[in-house]
UniProtKB/Swiss-Prot annotation:
Leader peptide range in chain numbering: 1-20
Species for this entry: Dictyostelium discoideum
Extracellular side: 21-651
Name assigned to this protein: Protein psiH
High-level lineage: Eukaryota, Amoebozoa, Evosea, Eumycetozoa, Dictyostelia
Topology term for the membrane: Single-pass type I membrane protein
UniProt entry keywords in alphabetical sequence: Glycoprotein, Membrane, Signal, Transmembrane, Transmembrane helix
UniProt main location, coarse: membrane
PANTHER family named in the record: PROTEIN PSIB-RELATED-RELATED, PROTEIN PSIH-RELATED
Stretches for region Disordered: 690-715
NCBIfam families on file: Fibro_Slime
A Gene Ontology cellular-component term: extracellular region
Side of membrane Cytoplasmic, spans: 673-715
InterPro entries named among the record's database cross-references: Fibro_Slime, PA14/GLEYA, PA14_dom, Prespore-cell_inducing_factor
Length: 715
């Protein structure tokens, strides 16, 4: 039967290759080229490993944060963080000026390709001579190529960031060895802590001990820095099936757009009063060619006006186009002629203060298109008592009243009188009207009582206004104002008392309350206070403002979002709150998630976990109009040897090899190498090494015999 062994070997290899794990796992990320001139945390004096440099929780920025920014902190000193404030630029793009310790760096996309080790069933990246960006970044310019390891130039100063995800299968672990700083976060928790300037150090994590939920998807974030000559090493071993959840418009996994967009060059609009910014990372950009260019990106850039908030209501703050700086200029309060308002001064809280020009004794205080509305006769009638036997008008001293039925002095015997507003005349006999009254007194009129002259004042002397002193001289009548009221007090024409008049105090600004007040020491003083709009309102979702022309206004409170993933909303009792942004896709096999650095919602294919991750693969079955989606487990075919209980390989097992393997063998035998190569390529078969076949391992169950295990004759 030995003649069958070569054939059996070939068939088993072919079948295993078809269903083996992918031979490589590519992890995409970003390298940030650093230089000691711009960040003195690179190339300091040598150090050693230092734990607890960074916080144990990864924030929404998805980069580590130092525990302390104090350069004299012992941990920072031991970890060779010479200038802790520059740590923020280890894993984030910085387009700072190329000046000493500015933090400037150059972002470069990178792919790490891990190869599958079938014996260990892990993916491995191993490079003990790890210089991935020689002649790139700053080192495009030869003046930066000043560091070497004794045998030649290399770029020794860079930081690597990988922001990925994985769906937990329940069997994962991670192993690392290398230098210098290495931090690994799973589910945003620090699980590998190899900080500091050190030679090769080892770190590992048994993911099954982290309390993760099988089938759930978690973040896997890896951070690595090379900060010192003369060596650079890295080795990763893991069975984590990490994947990239999203790409920026530069094509970088979880990127921020900085590898192909620079806000100062790509997005510069040439205006000093705008803040130029690259598009959000998930922006869909139409490319003119195969490679994205500045010209492609520029239309999607944002240019936000520089904000220059006004310091108060009496000053404007605007951006100076020549400098880009905010410049304050005072407001000019001008007369509002159409409103009959004369500008007086400016109050920082209320704005421009005005005085009405409609304050004359015959002004009503109302302005009509720039003209003061005068008191009408009816207005004066209402003001002075509205006696139907009087005629009312407004004169230079204000409202006045005259008899409706005046006496004619030339006919003293015909006495005029008014009866309920109707003029009548009573004719007197000679004895009643001619009793020796002095005709020379022009301010009196005849009046006889029992043939005795009892003169009466001529009509019109009393104007009915208690605020004037009425006199008659040689028949000339005078109404002199009684100026006994001070400040904003005015005389009441009916009672003659001084009343407080708020009208006098009006300043034409609807945002002030203007009141005439008196105290024991001061009479008639105008007080102006700022209107408190909404003072009694209890609804925290209504906001109030005041317009000096229209007064109090109300509007709904607009609660701002916090970042990209917290949506602002308003609660009438608590005010502004936030809630997580919903990214539900409605499709079972598509997962929606909000990522702060992505600028909002992302969507990626759901990865299903298998019941047994070593022997099965998880498959997602999408929902339909009538059925819900679900995950199912499918056995690997052929089943790996370690997954068979009490498996004994025999010719019967071999005879059960799939038809695909037999067909491949036939093509190989009868078609030669070229025919076989064509068959392989036409099916896009990915081959790993022959040692990926678990049938060449000893039976892990301890029973039965594997005839191909350690049998050199089979090879």
């Amino acid at each position: 039967m030995n003649y069958l062994k070569p054939t059996i070997f070939l068939i088993l290899c072919l079948v295993t290759f078809v269903y083996s794990q992918p031979s490589t796992l590519t992890i995409q990320g970003t390298i940030f080229d650093q230089h000691p001139d711009y960040n003195n945390n690179f190339e300091p004096k040598g150090g050693s490993i230092k734990k607890n440099l960074v916080l144990k929780t990864l924030g929404s920025s998805k980069v580590p944060t130092l525990v302390s920014l104090d350069p004299e902190d012992d941990t920072n000193e031991d970890g060779r963080m010479i200038t802790p404030s520059l740590f923020q630029y280890f894993y984030q793009t910085s387009s700072k000026p190329l000046t000493k310790n500015s933090g400037a760096n150059v972002p470069i996309p990178i792919n790490l390709v891990l190869n599958y080790d079938s014996k260990k069933q892990v993916y491995v990246y191993n490079d003990q001579y790890f210089f991935p960006i020689d002649y790139q970044g700053f080192d495009v310019d030869s003046k930066y190529r000043t560091y070497n390891n004794g045998s030649g130039y290399h770029n020794f100063h860079f930081c690597l960031k990988l922001n990925t995800k994985f769906t937990y299968q329940g069997i994962e672990d991670f192993y690392f060895i290398g230098d210098d700083d290495v931090w690994v976060f799973i589910n945003n928790k620090l699980v590998v802590d190899l900080g500091g300037l050190h030679s090769r150090e080892t770190g590992s994590v048994d993911v099954t001990k982290l309390g993760l939920t099988k089938g759930s998807t978690y973040d896997f974030d890896f951070f690595y820095c090379e900060r010192h000559t003369t060596a650079s090493t890295i080795r990763i071993e893991t069975n984590l099936q990490v994947f990239c959840p999203w790409y920026d418009y530069c094509g970088v996994c979880s990127g921020d757009g900085s590898t192909c967009c620079n806000k100062d060059t790509t997005c510069n609009d040439g205006k000093k009063c705008t803040i130029d910014a690259c598009p959000p990372p998930k922006t869909v950009i139409n490319k003119a060619g195969s490679k994205i260019t500045d010209a492609d990106i520029a239309p999607y850039c944002s240019h936000t006006d520089v904000s220059c908030p006004d310091p108060d209501l009496c000053n404007n703050n605007n951006c100076d186009a020549s400098t880009g700086n905010c410049k304050t200029t005072p407001i000019t309060c001008s007369n509002q002629d159409s409103k009959c308002l004369l500008a007086q001064t400016c109050d920082p809280k209320s704005g421009c203060i005005y005085k009405s020009k409609c304050t004359g004794v015959c002004d009503t205080g109302v302005c009509d298109g720039g003209d003061c509305v005068q008191k009408s006769n009816s207005t004066c009638a209402n003001e002075l008592g509205n006696n139907p036997c009087m005629v009312y008008s407004c004169g230079k001293n204000g409202c006045e009243a005259k008899p409706k039925c005046p006496q004619n002095p030339s006919t003293p015997c015909d006495v005029a009188y008014c009866d309920a507003g109707e003029c009548k005349v009573q004719h007197l006999s000679a004895s009643e009207c001619n009793c020796g009254c002095d005709a020379s007194d022009l301010c009196s009129k005849n009046n006889c009582v029992n043939n005795v002259c009892v003169p009466l004042p001529i009509d019109g002397i009393d104007d009915g206004n208690a605020c004037t002193k009425d006199t008659c001289v040689n028949g000339n009548i005078f109404h002199t104002p009684i100026n006994k009221c001070s400040g904003c007090m005015t005389c009441n024409p009916v009672s003659g008392n001084c009343d407080l008049s708020d009208t006098v105090c009006q300043d034409g600004n609807e945002c002030t309350t203007n009141v005439c007040e008196s105290s024991d020491s001061v009479l008639g003083v105008c007080t102006n206070s700022t209107v408190e709009c909404g003072a009694t309102n209890t609804d925290k979702c209504i906001q109030f403002s005041c317009n000096e022309a229209t007064g109090c206004q109300q509007s709904a409170v607009v609660c701002p979002d916090v970042g990209s993933c917290l949506v602002g909303y308003c609660d009438s009792k608590q005010g502004c709150l936030t809630k997580p942004r919903s990214c539900d896709t409605g499709v079972f096999c598509l997962t929606g998630e909000c990522i702060e650095n992505a600028g909002g919602c992302i969507v990626y294919e759901k990865r299903c976990d298998a019941d047994n991750g070593r022997c099965q693969q998880g498959v997602c079955v999408n929902n339909t109009a009538t059925e819900e989606g679900y995950c199912k487990s499918e056995d690997y075919d052929p089943l790996p040897f370690i997954c068979k209980t009490g498996a004994v390989v025999s010719t019967a097992v071999i005879a059960g090899v799939t038809v695909a393997g037999a067909v491949a063998l036939g093509v190989f035998i009868y078609g030669g190498k070229r025919g076989y190569d064509y068959w392989k390529e036409s099916r896009n078969v990915q081959f790993s090494g022959s040692n990926s076949n678990p049938l060449y391992e000893q039976n892990p169950n301890g029973s039965g015999v594997n005839p191909l295990y350690n049998d050199n004759s089979a090879l």
